[in-house]
Amino acid sequence: MSTLILTLPLARSGPATEYPYTLSPDGHNATRHARASAALLPAMGRAASEVVAVVPVRALSWQRVTLPPGISLQSPRLRAVLEGLLEERLLDDPAQLHFALQPGARPGTPAWVAICDRAWLRESLQALEAAGHPPARVVPELAPASDGPCELHALGTPEEAHLVITGHGPEQSVAVLPLSGAALTLAGPLVLGDEPPAILAEPAVATLAEKLLGRPVQLRTDSERALRAARSDWDLAQFDLASSGRTRALRKF
């Protein structure tokens, strides 16, 4: 199935907003990677086509919760239950935030909740829908590691570079740090130790990452990262957004 993978901009969407996109025939390989406004994105084909929206790692925060026994994942009370579990940990009003549970979450078992600005996400998806590109799924650019090794990702530009750590700490969370000497010192042995994990760096910041970390990096483009994100089991379009993407895509055909 051919897939158009779009990365949502951190700023609010407008007519001139450009989206980095990757076009893939199989979800693994890219046939095109570029940037375009919503009106100029590649036209999709027949029912085999899918649009996937990627939420940037810097737009998300993550919290670990344990759902109470007996709560159904289809319950209309689930959103209110999450608000109750999270309200003392959040800096913003829960009503202004969008929540999404990790795939396979079960009552009585710890699960990750992805959190982002509710109005920003809704406006971003509406802008794509208005341009004829309704996302069938919404996925995180990077997410907590359920298993596997810790990973370091160097992202951005030399002027605004970040280091993202997935599989961070005993809960295997996601941490986002400035890619700077001071921040790396605070990160401690995970980044600067004797056996640190491999670094996956975007080409624009590869030299900076090698200089600061003192070791070679593996190149990984934002297109490759988007392809990997689209293959994940995540779908952030939950609760009030649950029908907006998938249902629109199905209705279209």
Language-model features, listed with the residues they occupy:
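Hydrophobic/aromatic-enriched cytosolic interaction surfaces used to assemble or bind macromolecules
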Residues: M1-F253
